[in-house]
A protein has these predicted regions:
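Short glycine-rich anion-binding loops that position phosphate/pyrophosphate groups of nucleotides
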Residues: 15-16, 40, 84-88, 118, ...
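PLP-dependent aminotransferase class I/II
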Residues: 139-183
Length: 183
């Protein structure tokens, strides 16, 4: 349906491992990283661990301020973390807002779009079809997890969909046996 090929999917031991792998692959000391003030805490800890220059965008009513993201992102921005719906606030942004943001970002800037709570978003304006955006935005990675929606948090299984070249770079540092037989 979305033109997703097998080499555009990388399984991991949950989204947590993928956040770590993305940070280790794409963030160098001093790299500019943009993220929300209140969001999944692993974005902050892994970015700090890699020595990133963090630009924290304040929330508006506990929701992402994508206009604030546009102002914060510069030609030097290496990576942008997005969580939709946001963890821990539960707020979300609509597809048209996401597209406007993506179109304002340089193709040299990696955009990580985390959909860990995708299945729990019932609002009609929540973007149900982000995967089609990968065709136009090859600098975007979409993270998904099976742990939340299927109640299997202890099994630690997730995957990321995106450009095969980006996933190939991540795969070079991934442990070869990271996803267990049981998961």
């Amino acid at each position: 349906k979305y033109g997703i090929k097998p080499d555009m999917v990388l399984p991991t031991c949950g989204s947590d491992e993928m956040v770590d792998l993305i940070a280790k692959t794409f963030i160098d000391p001093g790299s500019e990283v943009v993220m929300a003030e209140v969001t999944f805490p692993r974005y902050l800890s892994t970015s700090q661990m890699m020595g990133a220059n963090l630009k924290i965008v304040p929330m508006k009513n506990m929701a992402y301020d994508l206009e604030g993201f546009r102002r914060a992102i510069t030609p030097q921005t290496r990576l942008v973390w997005l969580c939709n719906p946001n963890n821990p606030t539960g707020s979300f942004f609509a597809r048209d807002e996401l597209i406007r943001l993506l179109e304002s970002i340089s193709p040299e800037t990696l955009v990580v779009y985390d959909e860990a709570y995708f299945e729990f978003a019932a609002h009609p304006e929540y973007p149900r079809d982000s995967l089609d955006l990968l065709q136009r935005h090859r600098n975007m990675l979409v993270m998904k997890t099976l742990s939340k929606a299927y109640g299997i948090a202890g099994l630690r299984i997730g995957f990321t969909i995106g450009d095969s070249a980006l996933l190939g770079m991540i795969n070079k540092i991934r442990n070869p046996f990271n996803v267990t037989l049981l998961t």
